[in-house]
Amino acid sequence: MTSRFFTQVGSESEDESDYEVEVNEVQNDDVNNRYLQSGSEDDDDTDTKRVVKPAKDKRFEEMTYTVDQMKNAMKINDWVSLQENFDKVNKQLEKVMRITEAVKPPTLYIKTLVMLEDFLNEALANKEAKKKMSTSNSKALNSMKQKLKKNNKLYEDDINKYREAPEVEEEKQPEDDDDDDDDDDEVEDDDDSSIDGPTVDPGSDVDEPTDNLTWEKMLSKKDKLLEKLMNKDPKEITWDWVNKKFKEIVAARGKKGTARFELVDQLTHLTKIAKTPAQKLEILFSVISAQFDVNPGLSGHMPINVWKKCVLNMLTILDILVKYSNIVVDDTVEPDENETSKPTDYDGKIRVWGNLVAFLERVDTEFFKSLQCIDPHTREYVERLRDEPMFLALAQNIQDYFERMGDFKAAAKVALRRVEAIYYKPQEVYDAMRKLAELVEEEEETEEAKEESGPPTSFIVVPEVVPRKPTFPESSRAMMDILVSLIYRNGDERTKARAMLCDINHHALMDNFVTARDLLLMSHLQDNIQHMDISTQILFNRTMAQLGLCAFRAGMITESHSCLSELYSGQRVRELLAQGVSQSRYHEKTPEQERMERRRQMPYHMHLNLELLEAVHLICAMLLEVPNMAANSHDAKRRVISKNFRRLLEISERQAFTAPPENVRDHVMAATRALTKGDFQKAFEVLNSLEVWRLLKNRDSILDMVKDRIKEEALRTYLFTYSSSYESLSLDQLAKMFDVSEPQVHSIVSKMMINEELHASWDQPTRCIVFHEVQHSRLQSLAFQLTEKLSILAESNERAMESRTGGGGLDLSSRRRDNNQDYAGAASGGGGYWQDKANYGQGRQGNRSGYGGGRSSGQNGQWSGQNRGGGYAGRVGSGNRGMQMDGSSRMVSLNRGVRT
């Protein structure tokens, strides 16, 4: 038939009949306008009856079409196409057998195998034709030879029967198909009646398409099939029949073209008709595995509704294990094939393959990934967090089960997951979660499960034995103590290390700095953390950050700076804390590295506030560096406590115009400039204007502590700067200048004298400080310089040896602990005894490196004019303070996995 274009033009070369047909079609198109309701195609075809084919017929048609394509390929000797169609027909066979529930393959498939086998033998016999084949065709022929030989072994008996009597086998096939597909016929009848039943008036105002009704019937087909299975005679549904169906479904898992949700539904239906508790348990394990496969990618997460079903399935597994104590879950020994056929009243042990710990860890991982992917500023994120008690209830029940079974190693792994869900929560958040868990009702989840399972009930009914709600002690500390004690007794090395870090983190969160510090020093985790996995290194970094915040809240400025200094040494805070991806101008990351780093990110509710962390670090550095720079004004670069702070200060001083402070750095730099001039009031006002203080619950007491420390360091800075200008200085005058009580001034100055930071003495009758002039010989100055250089060389050699030996061997770290040069590497008690107790011994007889540095600096001061007491007086103690900061907390570089 010609085109309408020529019809509209009115070509005289066409037949008259064709012209009339085309004109009629054009007229019909004009009448049946698609924008008119009465002109719809569904109403126009009143004489055509819609035919709905059952799924079985559709699958057979697909297989028949593929077989026809194979015949065409045989005619042209195309083995490449033949190989592709052979793989295709094998996949279609699985679908056909699944739908028809037949034991034997259809005759069409056996006939195809016989045809292929004969054709292959002919092709192999014709060697001349084989030589003329192309390379791809020859490879496909050889591949087809192997595939067909392997495949035909599975159907040897059927092939032999067909070769003996092909006509008889073809006659038997329709009868078998009719017997196997009674259920499909009934569903087809229902579909036909639903389509033929409702008639629609073409002139009606509302035109409801019959496709919607058909779609509703198709949706209910699954439920009807299940109902048919449940209404079958129980004698027909045997353990063997269910086991065979179970193996067929499991065999299809992971294959291309298999719908994952459909696979989960099929396995879920099998749990309803399982004949024994062990069989139901075995199928439930496969259901959970299939649910994990719903989202196979690494970037996404399991759908939330599937996650909840997975948790409910695991609780059902625990119900079965608790009720039937003779059933044992084990993944080390392959159970017998007929193990699950043993009845309910069987007294012996029944082994079922499974791993509850692995499943729980996967559930926890999927929950973690969902929080990573959901936008934290939406309601959905908050709703997702409300599911956490559901996971904690599951973990608690699994841990109780393992403890009853005596498997304490597995119980320790489960306890670690519970610890990692609690350690970062303050007591207020813990109380809110505990109240939420008490208010959560189980009816919602139970109703959802009933709706999905449909009206039929299971053959094996398992009551809810294990509780669906978690139980929490009133104090989060009490719960942590119970869990970590179990882990310390029974966990492996990695589990113990992570539990220890979580325990330290929680102690720091609860303001127990001394306990947290002692746990860290006794565990020696800082010496071995570089050998652990990256997630544990991230946990270590988070713990050190929390420990630094705790020390700051307790007023321990030196210790706080020691914990945070390494964290801010490389400008990669976000990366080290897993709170963002850092970008470096010198190191470009591959897309794979970026994806891996994003997968390690912490969820938003677990983030540490970076502004607060930066403020604490810079304030601590300011309180330590300003007196240190005043004490070493002639050689400021020689003794550096915080390189990061010095760099920021240099950048700030190079600016021609200083704008009002905007961010945390600007505020701290402005406070530093004021403190350097001795204006402690302005320094405190600038710091007090920071917004981060509102994040602290005891804000007023912390600000009072900061103000007192600013006054103290302002006093020290003043004495370091102007001691050379005085012969004596009144105690009363110092107290009035810095608004500090006289006993406190006396204590500060006396400590500086004892530590040889200030070369002076007290005149008790007049209550004055008398400054002394110090002069050194040339030999003494050279000796002090040599001592300092030797100490630096020895320390560098120790670090080089330690990096080569991995921190062990010659016990060089213990020597550094004895010298009080490493906070985090200190031994329990001795080396890390903080500034107050360590400085006394270090000033005169302890740390030779600090002493030597002070003497050398003093001599330099003497050469430059021998100011009164200025050279020697303020050097040694500041040297000691600097040495305490070295190598402090052993933060870990995640890119290289070594200490930075």
Swiss-Prot record:
GO terms for cellular component: cytosol; eukaryotic 43S preinitiation complex; eukaryotic 48S preinitiation complex; eukaryotic translation initiation factor 3 complex. Residues 1-52, 128-147, 163-213, 798-900 are annotated as: Disordered. GO terms for biological process: formation of cytoplasmic translation initiation complex. Pfam families: eIF-3c_N, PCI. Its main location: cytoplasm. Residues 867-880 have a biased composition (Gly residues). This is Eukaryotic translation initiation factor 3 subunit C. PROSITE patterns: PCI (PS50250). Residues 12-23, 167-194 have a biased composition (Acidic residues). SMART domains: PINT. Residues 604-776 form the PCI domain. Component of the eukaryotic translation initiation factor 3 (eIF-3) complex (Potential). Binds to the translation initiation factors TIF3C1 and TIF3H1. Interacts with CSN1 (Potential). Associates with the CSN (COP9 signalosome) complex. It comes from the Eukaryota. It comes from Arabidopsis thaliana. The modification Phosphotyrosine is found at residue 35. InterPro entries: EIF3C (IPR027516), EIF3C_N_dom (IPR008905), PCI_dom (IPR000717), WH-like_DNA-bd_sf (IPR036388), WH_DNA-bd_sf (IPR036390). Residues 1-10, 134-145 have a biased composition (Polar residues). The keyword Heme does not apply. The modification Phosphoserine is found at residues 38, 40, 204. Component of the eukaryotic translation initiation factor 3 (eIF-3) complex, which is involved in protein synthesis of a specialized repertoire of mRNAs and, together with other initiation factors, stimulates binding of mRNA and methionyl-tRNAi to the 40S ribosome. The eIF-3 complex specifically targets and initiates translation of a subset of mRNAs involved in cell proliferation. Belongs to the eIF-3 subunit C family. One of its GO terms (molecular function) is translation initiation factor activity.
